[in-house]
Curated annotation (Swiss-Prot):
The gene is prfA. It comes from the Bacteria. It comes from Streptococcus agalactiae serotype V (strain ATCC BAA-611 / 2603 V/R). Methylated by PrmC. Methylation increases the termination efficiency of RF1. GO terms for cellular component: cytoplasm. This is Peptide chain release factor 1. The keyword Protein biosynthesis applies.
Amino acid sequence: MNIYDQLQAVEDRYEELGELLSDPDVVSDTKRFMELSREEASTRETVTAYREYKQVIQNISDAEEMIKDASGDAELEEMAKEELKESKAAKEEYEERLKILLLPKDPNDDKNIILEIRGAAGGDEAALFAGDLLTMYQKYAETQGWRFEVMESSVNGVGGIKEVVAMVSGQSVYSKLKYESGAHRVQRVPVTESQGRVHTSTATVLVMPEVEEVEYEIDQKDLRVDIYHASGAGGQNVNKVATAVRMVHIPTGIKVEMQEERTQQKNRDKAMKIIRARVADHFAQIAQDEQDAERKSTVGTGDRSERIRTYNFPQNRVTDHRIGLTLQKLDTILSGKMDEVIDALVMYDQTQKLEALNK
């Protein structure tokens, strides 16, 4: 099947999906309706581009016909030639774009995410840097019109982040932030350093797609839920009623504690969101590890401990080690203007996938 047959098949399926989503039987089946809605959304950009491409092809045909029929009208012929030139250039651009749009889609790209950031090697300095990363992602989310909600956080004595869990919601969140998982290294002079020496510290980032209950169901028998009194700074109990929730997935040992909300039910709901994402991610990682060759063709190796990026403060430099990208814009990037880095990662990933398909 050539590229045009593939595009026509995508358009035909898109139209079929539109009819299915109007079918009362489909609407009443929540799981199927969600699956078909996602499929329609994932193909919409491709179909729109293909329809625009077909219009460009028609414009080329019309311009060629106009040149033939100009009959000595120099002005009309010149106008038609200009239209032909522009349309041919547009045709080439659309063909390149459509090749990328036809690449196999990551089914999670349109999803919201659970974002986890932890201070790692480097003590207080690592925790402070984890706080810088949190601010960077919060500000980037603002530029994208996304909702950023801190679900759970733990700070240290100097105001750094030991661990933070956040939900980021909006359009195509996972597609842009999925490349952020890994170890982020910082090189700078800590505030407490009297000799002016540069120290190296690390914070880790984990990005997981949000998993709906209809997509991944956890057997309640596999969960142990403990209810306890939420504690504040210094360990004092801050609620007379036990509202904090500790949830453990027994088969994997994955644990979530939630006490940010004032009611037990809200803490339970948030804990369930996180544990569902973590358990699904745990098994997805096992499956990914079994497909080692495929994993190596994507950005990085998929290893969660892989050092993906270095932030060098003295030189105002950010280096992404996976794609060899270096930018002297550390201050700009940490202020949330991450597009240049993320766009480069997306482009690299798409190029790698195109090359793999052409082999």
